[in-house]
């Protein structure tokens, strides 16, 4: 290989890295909203919980266990959606193969 080919490959690798970083930044800004029977949970692509909204009807002290279960279900579903979004980004990366 000559220097021209190596330089071109390095440029392609840098371009690919920039594209991945841009997609990650877009994902981090994206919000994922999950609703479960009066409970709304909002997370961002960094897996940070941004908001929890609980319908007043769910706040009855006798319903504490139900509320906790709903929170758990909503949170886990949100995490699955975020993981799916991360996998979509990974699919766009040539399976660990750089152009050299």
From Swiss-Prot:
SUPFAM superfamilies, alphabetized: YbaB-like
GO cellular component terms attached to this protein's record: bacterial nucleoid; cytosol
GO molecular function, one term: DNA binding
Main location: cytoplasm
Compartment list: Cytoplasm, Nucleoid
One matching Pfam family: YbaB_DNA_bd
Keyword check for Transmembrane: no
Keywords annotated in UniProt: Cytoplasm, DNA-binding
Key word Iron-sulfur present: no
InterPro entries: YbaB-like_sf (IPR036894), YbaB/EbfC (IPR004401)
Domain of life: Bacteria
PANTHER family: NUCLEOID-ASSOCIATED PROTEIN YBAB
Quaternary state and interactors: Homodimer.
Recorded family membership: Belongs to the YbaB/EbfC family.
Protein purpose: Binds to DNA and alters its conformation. May be involved in regulation of gene expression, nucleoid organization and DNA protection.
Name this protein carries in UniProt: Nucleoid-associated protein MYPU_0500
């Amino acid at each position: 290989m000559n220097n021209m080919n190596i330089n071109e490959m390095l440029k392609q690798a840098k371009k690919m890295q920039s594209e991945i970083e841009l997609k990650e930044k877009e994902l981090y800004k994206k919000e994922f909203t999950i609703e479960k029977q009066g409970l709304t949970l909002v997370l961002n692509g960094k897996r940070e919980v941004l908001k929890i909204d609980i319908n007043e009807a769910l706040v009855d002290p006798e319903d504490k266990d139900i509320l906790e279960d709903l929170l758990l279900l909503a949170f886990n579903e949100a995490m699955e959606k975020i993981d799916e979004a991360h996998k979509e980004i990974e699919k766009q990366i040539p399976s660990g193969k750089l152009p050299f």
